[in-house]
Amino acid sequence: MNLQRFPRYPLTFGPTPIQPLKRLSEHLGGKVELYAKREDCNSGLAFGGNKTRKLEYLVPDALEQGADTLVSIGGVQSNQTRQVAAVAAHLGMKCVLVQEHWVNYEDPVYDRVGNIQLSRMMGADVRLVSDGFDIGIRRSWEEAMESVRQAGGKPYPIPAGCSEHPLGGLGFVGFAEEVRAQEAQLGFKFDYIVVCSVTGSTQAGMVVGFAADGRANRVIGIDASATPERTHEQITRIARHTAELVDLGRPITTADVVLDTRYAGPEYGLPNDGTLEAIRLCARLEGMLTDPVYEGKSMHGMIDKVQLGEFEPGSKVLYAHLGGVPALSAYHETFRNG
């Protein structure tokens, strides 16, 4: 496997820490050891997160093309767009963000706080659009890029989650290589890796990276899209493309892509009672915060799978904390009493 041939622009602090979740493990019976890899602490750029790791491989391409404006898209409380805005500010580039109405959640301050507030503070041109949730290529995003061209700028396209970008899976191939180096220091290997999936390139990169040592199907995606068939297809397609890019040496099969669909409800961006319980439990036992859109759902999935006995006794499970906490303030009614 050859990830090193791709240029990488450093935006992160370095390898993200792996933290034992001792109290949560004990609370759940102590038969499974839980750990978290803290991608939410990976950068000084506006709280970082998983997209910052991905953007390290997109930035060299943007610079080589002579782009002057990063153009991205997401929901109103998109973590992706906040991280793109931070990278643009860091590079001295302009930034245009299309923020669609992906979540059926009404709150008078939803579009004024959290991620979107931070993006505005960093100077991004934020454009609110009424279109609903979709993980594919969007006309509103293409129109934003054309508007930059018409104004004499040179846009660089960054799709939702970086996922439809040809280089979008590379960052989390690197994640897997990083975990292997940390496992060598820890003296053990993780039996499972739990990760939230929506647009797909995070899990796709992990699948490719862990396929190198036979653990592709030990990457357990927890769907948060509530459109699991499309998400599974997108993960698989991105993984196959990424495997070719890095010369994995074997094809990615549908069996390599494991996506648990039980925890996405009631729909994208809205938590169910189990997700809210998981968010509060993790916060109160570990002081680790998760959000109701993404990480709360993957935390719910991991906790439930432990309780159901779906991880063998003695298993070591790594939870990939991808970020997302800045969105919590947009759900202030949900968490008004903690």
Swiss-Prot record:
GO terms for molecular function: 1-aminocyclopropane-1-carboxylate deaminase activity; D-cysteine desulfhydrase activity; pyridoxal phosphate binding. Keywords: Hydrolase, Pyridoxal phosphate. It catalyses: 1-aminocyclopropane-1-carboxylate + H2O = 2-oxobutanoate + NH4(+). Its EC number is 3.5.99.7. The modification N6-(pyridoxal phosphate)lysine is found at K51. Its cofactor is pyridoxal 5'-phosphate. CDD domains: ACCD. InterPro entries: ACCD_DCysDesulf (IPR027278), ACP_carboxylate_deaminase (IPR005965), ACP_carboxylate_deaminase_bac (IPR020601), TrpB-like_PALP (IPR001926), TrpB-like_PALP_sf (IPR036052). Pfam families: PALP. The keyword Hydrolase applies. The active site is at S78 (nucleophile). The keyword Hydrolase applies. PANTHER family: 1-AMINOCYCLOPROPANE-1-CARBOXYLATE DEAMINASE-RELATED. Catalyzes a cyclopropane ring-opening reaction, the irreversible conversion of 1-aminocyclopropane-1-carboxylate (ACC) to ammonia and alpha-ketobutyrate. Allows growth on ACC as a nitrogen source. This is 1-aminocyclopropane-1-carboxylate deaminase. It comes from Burkholderia lata (strain ATCC 17760 / DSM 23089 / LMG 22485 / NCIMB 9086 / R18194 / 383).
